[in-house]
């Protein structure tokens, strides 16, 4: 049996570096799970007149800090430190002074470059999610926005990526400081805005909901993975494998990726890839000017192998196996590997048709791979109300949905930003009705441009997941016309309309609004849903629906 010291050594190695042969880029976790990383958290007010440039230097010492949790929230850090009584017990969470947490906080950590780093390589600092606003500093310099700007990164789904090559120290301590600012809306539990919707894009339920308490700080923090990647000058961004299915016996694949040249000189780049199973190999050359990004696309006209005979199709739970493929992409310059990306995807085809139900009313019906699907599922409100659900815990929760014979989860207001949620939905054949972050009072969205930027990042980040079955604009309402039009046009471009965009979760033919409108079972078979009076089409299954116990 491995002793404790051995386990620690292995954990350090795995957390610090993931390498493989000469082709793999160096990757280093900056999460709290890395035993060499300690995040320090402290209110900005306690560091008055001290700048981010000062905090992000080795000479600065942050005293009386709370140990941060990354990914996580400011409030969670105080809970884990034992400063706040267990908020799950009794009414403890209602006794917390929310004003202490509803203000800006500093995060700070130090690290050293891994020994595998070699001179001349490009170093990138990544943050997958920060809520609600973030300003970033590195080794004494502000790296986000401008020197005079604040709240540079706006929204909980927006990825941040910084080229820190010229600031990184090859030996000795490197320092990161992040100023996290909470949302501007609903600063107290009793604020007039009942749901704090105007803070979108954010975790809306953090401001309190009819099924969830108000969370002090409203889930502000570094809520996604933080990590360092070392590459060459040329990197790939947002790679995408798209599948078309003319017949069940033949699939046509296309591969695209943005190629970013971070150097000042032009580069001749070779992008090669391998898709498994099937050992489908391909490559294509592209010239990328210095300091620019170019789009590379490869399809069946370039590579005949991208036409796949007898593909292994992805099916939802109960209709077949949720088969998955992997695609490993490598970009090289002058025969040397500059970047490597690997993604998982599924070959499938979603269709949405108006089909008459048993009493002759047309209802919108889901098909996948030509097969009509009877949807079974429910709402997913929050993975955990303090964002403490991570990693393998998602597998347990998604697997249980499969074992309940569900095949769909409605992701209420897009409340999950963790990639693992979608990974396990892919694995277990659970389709996702994927909302954006809007609710009823759509005109109150304070920053529509931030909303659009987050929405674009969401689609690019998630579109490889075969489990995503539909994009939905808003919960129980329509987005404002400007946002609605943007979402529709953006999804048509970025996801090629492979999945439907639906404006509203419970109107325009949808058949229910959860336990607000319980119906007897016969309602689902004899009528077209809650819009019967207007003779408008409805779904055969109301994704918000519940059945009252007296009817079961």
What is the role of each PLM region?
Residues 37, 41-46, 77, 81, ...:
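Accessory beta-strand-rich segments of carbohydrate-active enzymes
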Residues 16-27:
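Bacterial Sec-dependent signal peptides at the C-terminal "C-region" and cleavage site
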Residues 76-113, 117-126, 131-138, 144-153, ...:
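Active-site-adjacent substrate/metal-binding segments within catalytic domains
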């Amino acid at each position: 049996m491995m002793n404790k010291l051995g386990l620690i050594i292995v954990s350090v190695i795995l957390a610090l570096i993931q390498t493989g042969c000469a082709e793999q880029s160096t990757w280093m976790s900056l999460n709290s799970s890395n035993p060499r990383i300690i995040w320090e958290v402290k209110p900005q007010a306690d560091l008055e007149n001290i700048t981010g440039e000062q905090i992000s230097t080795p000479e600065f010492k942050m005293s009386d800090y709370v140990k941060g949790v990354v990914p996580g929230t400011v409030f969670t850090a105080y809970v884990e430190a034992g400063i706040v009584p267990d908020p799950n017990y009794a009414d403890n969470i209602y006794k917390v002074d929310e004003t202490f947490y509803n203000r800006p906080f500093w995060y700070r950590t130090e690290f050293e470059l891994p020994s595998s780093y070699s001179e001349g390589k490009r170093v990138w600092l990544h943050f997958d999610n920060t809520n609600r606003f973030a300003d970033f500093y590195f080794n004494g310099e502000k790296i986000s926005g401008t020197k005079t700007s604040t709240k540079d990164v706006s929204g909980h789904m927006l990825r941040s990526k910084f080229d820190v090559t010229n600031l990184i120290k090859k030996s000795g301590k490197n320092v990161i400081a992040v100023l996290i600012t909470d949302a501007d809306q609903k600063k107290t539990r009793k604020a007039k805005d009942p749901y704090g919707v105007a803070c979108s894009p954010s975790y809306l339920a953090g401001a309190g909901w009819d099924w969830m308490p108000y969370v002090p700080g409203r889930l502000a923090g570094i809520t996604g993975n933080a990590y360092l990647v070392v590459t060459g000058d040329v990197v790939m961004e947002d790679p995408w494998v798209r599948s078309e299915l003319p017949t069940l016996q033949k699939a046509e694949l296309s591969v695209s990726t943005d190629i970013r040249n971070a150097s000042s000189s032009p580069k001749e780049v070779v992008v090669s890839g391998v898709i498994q199973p099937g050992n489908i190999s391909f490559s294509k050359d592209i010239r990328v000017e210095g300091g620019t990004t170019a789009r590379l696309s490869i399809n069946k006209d370039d590579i005949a192998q991208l036409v796949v005979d007898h593909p292994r199709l992805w099916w939802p739970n109960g209709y077949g196996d949720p088969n998955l493929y992997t695609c490993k992409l490598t970009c090289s310059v002058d025969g040397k590997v500059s970047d490597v990306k690997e993604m998982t995807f599924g070959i499938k085809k979603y269709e949405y048709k108006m089909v008459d139900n048993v009493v002759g009313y047309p209802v919108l019906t889901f098909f996948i791979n030509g097969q009509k699907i009877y949807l079974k599922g429910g709402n997913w409100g929050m993975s955990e109300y303090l964002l403490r659900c991570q990693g393998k815990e998602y597998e347990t929760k998604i697997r249980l949905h499969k074992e309940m014979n569900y095949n769909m989860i409605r992701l209420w207001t897009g409340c999950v930003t963790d990639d693992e949620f979608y990974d396990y939905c892919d694995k277990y054949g659970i389709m996702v009705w994927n909302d954006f972050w809007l609710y009823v009072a759509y005109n109150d969205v304070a920053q529509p441009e931030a909303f659009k930027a987050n929405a674009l990042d969401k689609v690019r980040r998630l579109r490889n997941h075969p489990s995503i079955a539909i994009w939905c604009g808003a919960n129980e309402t329509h987005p404002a016309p400007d946002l609605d039009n943007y979402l529709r046009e953006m999804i048509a471009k970025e996801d090629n309309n492979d999945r439907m965009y639906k404006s509203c979760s419970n109107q325009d033919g949808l058949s229910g609004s959860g336990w607000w409108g319980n119906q007897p079972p016969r309602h689902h078979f004899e009528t077209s849903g809650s819009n019967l009076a207007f003779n408008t089409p409805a779904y055969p299954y109301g994704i918000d629906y519940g059945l009252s116990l007296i009817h079961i």
